[in-house]
């Protein structure tokens, strides 16, 4: 009985351990980590800098049943400012419906004789991508584990500002898994 309790405790502990510590040097120097998106704002916050990295070895296809796809990967967000230098590690799970890719929507609009304005309006509201971000860890730039106080979130991924970062990350995951951009897939 006691052995069973220890085994269950070990299994529970294994699933609550945060992701492996990582430093900014490792993100910058290892070919395993690909820069997805980079932001240096203009104006009053020009001293801030954020870079998102994809751990290319973490990419896992969870669902492949055309037109539906689901991909999981680890994404690191390195944020640097005069006040703080921190790396956030998140597990991303993105669901894709290629019937709503831009190419699919344009194809169907052409078949129906719809106007370009109609296609643009539909494409802005129906992206075909939904993402879940689950925090794995938070680290200083030298790799020290920091406390995390964020819950997982699931939301639609849109093509327009201000959420282009999430869109670019989701498109990069699709590209890394299938060597084509999500928007280029046509479902007739």
Segments and roles (model prediction):
Residues 2-8:
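Sec-dependent signal peptide recognition
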Residues 21-90, 97-188:
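N-terminal secretory-pathway/extracellular module detecting exported/lumenal segments
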Residues 5, 17-18, 23:
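Homeobox/homeodomain signature
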Residues 8-16:
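Bacterial N-terminal signal peptides
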